[in-house]
């Protein structure tokens, strides 16, 4: 077997917020990738606007550095469970991995998932205990917990023999022993050269598995992946083997490799390289691009099943078409099906209604990122409340179940216990550090997590962190009754006035400001009772020919509650929708007319 000793391919994997992207920043900066006078932002790999806003990695990305004459291809992966499909998709390009574990939090749900994926692929692991500069760091305990995780997941005895490094990605230092003085990030790079095996070069003609796609308005589709056999050059002929076994022949236009944040145009790339090629138009992630003389397909990428679903529909509100650039069924359908090309965890199905589509994903965040992306692109549509995806196994209804881990303070245990018991959660473990901080671990149905994140943040007053990961399927435990209060629903269309809002605020909280355009059936607030209340938010104060000296003093209003997209999705009930446009996020009833809603309630009672 031939090896390419001039290359190492390594993936950086971890739970969300354990410091992957910050560590990549340090590797890039200390490898002299940037000019000395060049300003470089933090988390430079998270170039997407939503990634920067939310502080998480959403899409996996490739970069490369040169160190001691060896090119190190680095694959930065997401840490959030909702984007675990990205990890499954790209981890096959690597020969080794850096597993980052927070020195305080220790192994978390996604740590187990990403390590399991790495072990199944046979990657050589390097454990990096990150954020060692934290005062609360508990090194020995975290190392023991991580070693137990390796013992549970290792598929070969070799995977139990791994080095341990200690790092502070924010400070750009790493060390092989605790107590050493960290000077730079070089110990990690030296360990990669020593531990991660060089790519094995199998004999044969060109063969590449497409693990990612990009698009350029001038170059068209860009296929990204690792070359497993042979070599490729511009103007070479190749065939693309898709999931159906069909083969289409193309001529390669350009071949790129990675260095820093750039793609470099090259005349030739060989087995072991991670490349991007143009000229292959009809290609999907998981396809094999190969030599026409020997078109052998590589095993396709297997991605886990989605766990929640919701409908996307054409906007049917009275304000439809006013604020969006893309509003039609054709445009919405084309955009959703186009997303399938690079978002492997997503599923899209047509429904009986021509203007409504069923979209399935790995979690609320997974789908909300898609919704927000489409909103910013100019799409206008409406979405329903998410639901857990059930399936029937041997005649029994099964539902997805997840592990929920919460870090908070002792004072929040009571309220969280009450909230989660109403959502069919079972407490499986609890750890108290003796300083007022607790770690709670629950097993909970996915349906019990829908809408919980917003309530969790409110109950803990922001003093808590929650993480989840899917465990599998268990028998259906029954429906969960909504505990949400009733809403205030606009009974007339028009412009919301201060007098009308003041009247509404006597009944509850409002969601809109004065001078907001509203329509009948739009949700404008909430109150404490369980029933919905129709209210005329456009009501004016009656005029008389007699005025007192204080009659025209302006009305004092409580500031409106403004929902983010995620909060709006969490808030709605089954009979409600979120109207999404580039300019506004509105809540509404599915049936806008008050009389239609009454008839619907009456007919359901008769059916019961």
Predicted ranges, named:
Residues 231, 281-282, 361-367, 409-413, ...:
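Helix N-cap motif at beta-to-alpha junctions
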Residues 124, 134-194:
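Canonical P-loop GTPase G-domain recognition
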Residues 1-101, 105-107, 141, 145, ...:
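P-loop NTPase switch module centered on the Walker A-proximal segment
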